[in-house]
Structures are given as structure tokens and as C-alpha cells.
Regions:
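Short helix-perturbing small/polar motifs within transmembrane alpha-helices
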Residues: 1-178
């Protein structure tokens, strides 16, 4: 059930598409998910990107997901790096930034595009931190049976991103997620 839930959350995060090609949500989600759920979250995120993005953007984000999954798996083997709290955020930033720079240099460089890609990677860094904090809070909740105030904020941020992905769904011209 948890694998299916991670797949669906990855699919929802991959379907968030802001400004027609600004979607770091699923890459941040995949880097924040714990080890055994990484593959299902990555497959869901890739499916979300394929269903909602154009070919070049979907390919760029899928390359970032693959890079993130490989780096997360490699760093899980190194005990010293495994304990670094910002590791998922750094991997998310690096994956988004490097794939964006590859697209930028292939299409021709412009200052505006560079800053858009830099802001996307920075947003991916922040979102990955929020997602990993929310997953840590859910892990603590399941082991101790309660949330702290900080954990409630982290889980609330995760839920708001999920609602953002559902904001395009309308029922009688009203969006329940909004």
C-alpha cells in the first residue's frame, strides 16, 4: 500500500506544471522519499511528467529523476553522507540545475533562462527539504504516536503541494482543492 501511495504522490507531483515548463516538485519528492520507496516514487513522477509535459521538458525531468535516484542509492551506501540532513536537497538542486544547464546550452544561452532554471533548482532544494522533513515527521508519528508543532507544519506543507497538483480538477466549474 505504501508503494502505491508513493507512486500516486509521485504522479501527482509530476503533474504540477507551472508556467508551462517549471515543475521541480516531483524531482524534490523523489529525492526526499526514503530508500525502499524511491523506485515507485520515481516511476510515478516519470509517469506524471510524461502525461503532462512536452517531450523536451519531460525528458529533462526524467533525466533529473534518474540522476537523483542513482545518487540517492549511492549515498545510502556511505554511512557518513547518509546522516547529512541536507543531502536530499543538495541532490535535488544538483540534478535539476545540471539537466537545466544541458538544455540551456543546447538551445542557446540567455540570462533570463539561466535565472529561471536557477530559481527552479532552488525551489527544488527547498521543496526537497520540506518533503524530507514531512516524511521524517510521519516516521516519528508512526513510531511515537504523535506530532510536534514543527511536524504539523511540515506535513501541512506536503499536503498543500498535493492540493496544488489537484487544483486544475474542477467540479461544476469550481476547484475543490482551491
Amino acid at each position: 500500500i505504501a508503494q502505491m501511495l508513493c507512486f500516486l504522490l509521485g504522479l501527482l507531483c509530476g503533474s504540477i506544471n507551472e508556467l508551462n515548463a517549471f515543475s521541480p516538485f516531483a524531482v524534490a519528492f523523489v529525492t526526499a522519499v526514503s530508500g525502499k520507496y524511491t523506485i515507485s516514487a520515481g516511476l510515478g513522477a516519470a509517469a506524471g511528467y510524461i502525461l503532462t509535459q512536452d517531450n523536451l521538458s519531460a525528458l529533462r525531468y526524467i533525466a533529473a529523476i534518474i540522476c537523483s535516484v542513482i545518487l540517492i542509492r549511492l549515498t545510502n551506501e556511505l554511512e557518513r553522507l547518509k546522516k547529512f540532513r541536507l543531502l536530499p536537497s543538495c541532490i535535488s538542486f544538483m540534478s535539476l540545475f545540471l539537466t537545466s544547464m544541458a538544455v540551456l546550452f543546447a538551445d542557446g544561452t540567455s540570462v533570463r533562462s539561466f535565472f529561471i532554471f536557477l530559481s527552479e533548482a532552488t525551489l527544488g532544494f527547498a521543496l526537497s527539504f520540506v518533503f524530507s522533513s514531512a516524511f521524517d515527521a510521519l516516521t516519528v508519528y508512526s513510531s511515537q504516536g504523535g506530532f510536534t508543532a514543527r511536524d504539523i507544519v511540515n506535513v501541512g506543507a506536503l499536503l498543500s503541494v498535493v492540493l496544488l497538483s489537484l487544483s486544475e480538477i474542477t467540479v461544476f466549474s469550481a476547484s475543490p482543492a482551491r
